[in-house]
Curated annotation (Swiss-Prot):
It comes from the Bacteria. One of its GO terms (cellular component) is cytoplasm. This is Thiazole synthase. The active site is at residue 96. It is an enzyme of class 2 (transferase). It holds the Pfam family ThiG. GO terms for biological process: thiamine diphosphate biosynthetic process. It is found in: Cytoplasm. Keywords: Cytoplasm, Schiff base, Thiamine biosynthesis, Transferase.
Length: 255
């Protein structure tokens, strides 16, 4: 349906794999979402020790594009090191660059993110940075050569939806690479809204894994994302300040 670098994504829903109650719920939610992209924190995967638990042991990863992230990194060097670990372990070379700058809000550090992206691009990675909804930063990263930008809707795990739709619209309208809205989505309504703004996709985790019924929520998110994309492609009617009748005026003379 759309491409990031040389990778073709069939679904506009990218699914995080953490925080599920158990492997069965995780597996069923993945199936219900119909995603073909699974993202995970490299530090959770125990890539070099098969004796340690693997949180994706029940998933046939050959059926998916695996999308590792650098969660836990606080500096560019840490993010680069995590990406190298994933690459050397044979995981997909598309990397979500996540460098957290504040422990309370979990907002990304723009300076360290930029530096990490610069080095990883030089090393040949497909780079997708997680950023705040900052248009100028998104543009600078595009100029650097990133393959997608991933602006937040609101802080990670808050479920607050899109805090600043105007800024998000600026990023989407000016982007020459795919825009994946990442973090803060709480409901299918939020996901639909982001897609109506023109986002290329949504990355979700907590909104599904922490729902009362993650499997149903995975399906609901899939439908919300599809509806939002269809709405964007169809083109909504313009907002007006005066009423306009939907019925024709012909025939009123008979009244």
């Amino acid at each position: 349906m759309f491409k990031i670098g040389n990778l073709e994504l069939q679904s506009r829903l990218l699914l995080g794999t953490g925080k599920f109650e158990n492997e069965e719920v995780q597996s069923k939610a993945i199936e219900a979402s119909e995603t073909n992209v699974l993202t995970f924190a490299v530090r959770r995967m125990n890539l070099y020790d098969r004796n340690l638990p693997n949180p994706l042991a029940n998933v046939n990863l050959k059926d998916f594009i695996t999308f590792p992230n650098t969660a836990g990194a606080k500096t560019a060097q840490e993010a680069i090191r995590i990406a190298e670990i994933a690459n050397h372990a044979g995981v997909c070379d598309m990397i979500k660059v996540e460098v957290i700058g504040d422990d309370e809000t979990l907002l990304p550090d723009p300076f360290e993110t930029y530096e990490a992206c610069k080095v990883l691009l030089e090393k040949g990675y497909t780079v997708c940075p997680y950023i705040s909804n900052d248009l100028v930063l998104a543009q600078r990263l595009e100029e650097l050569g990133v393959h997608a930008v991933m602006p937040l809707a609101s802080p990670i795990g808050t479920g607050r939806g899109i805090n600043n739709p105007l800024n998000l619209s600026y990023i989407i309208e000016n982007a020459s690479v795919p825009v994946i809205v990442d973090a803060g989505i709480g409901s299918p309504k939020d996901a639909c809204h982001a897609m109506e703004l023109g986002a290329d996709g949504i990355l979700l985790n907590t909104a599904i894994s922490a729902a009362k019924d993650p499997v149903k929520m995975a399906e609901a998110m899939k439908l919300g994302i599809n509806a939002g994309r269809l709405s964007y492609e169809a083109g909504r009617i313009p907002v007006k300040y005066t009423a306009q009748a939907s019925s024709p005026s012909e025939g009123l003379g008979f009244l």
